[in-house]
């Protein structure tokens, strides 16, 4: 199943988010942490005003929403409490789908 993750960081956690950026990138690319989850696409969301990072969007493939949520909850950002909010939603991928 495919899922979309939309997460927004707390504004007051900007420095902590920046400090953890490399750890988060390593986490989503290292399959040993999450062998059942594949990250197909991802990127940062930006403020319209000054283009600072406000959060991120990921497209995941996982066997269930519970596994996808565990992946998000195990991330360096989640463990550090940087999220103002995060949502994992099932996604019906229609265009640009691999395979």
Label every model-predicted segment:
Residues 1-99:
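Conserved, structured core segments of small domains
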């Amino acid at each position: 199943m495919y899922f979309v993750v939309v997460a927004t960081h707390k504004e007051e956690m900007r420095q902590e988010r920046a400090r953890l950026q490399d750890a988060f990138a390593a986490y989503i690319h290292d399959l040993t942490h999450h062998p059942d989850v594949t990250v197909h696409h991802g990127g940062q969301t930006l403020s319209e005003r000054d283009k600072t990072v406000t959060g991120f969007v990921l497209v995941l493939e996982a066997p269930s929403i519970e596994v996808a949520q565990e992946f998000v909850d195990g991330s360096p950002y989640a463990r550090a409490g940087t999220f103002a909010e995060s949502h994992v939603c099932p996604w019906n991928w229609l265009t640009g789908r691999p395979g």
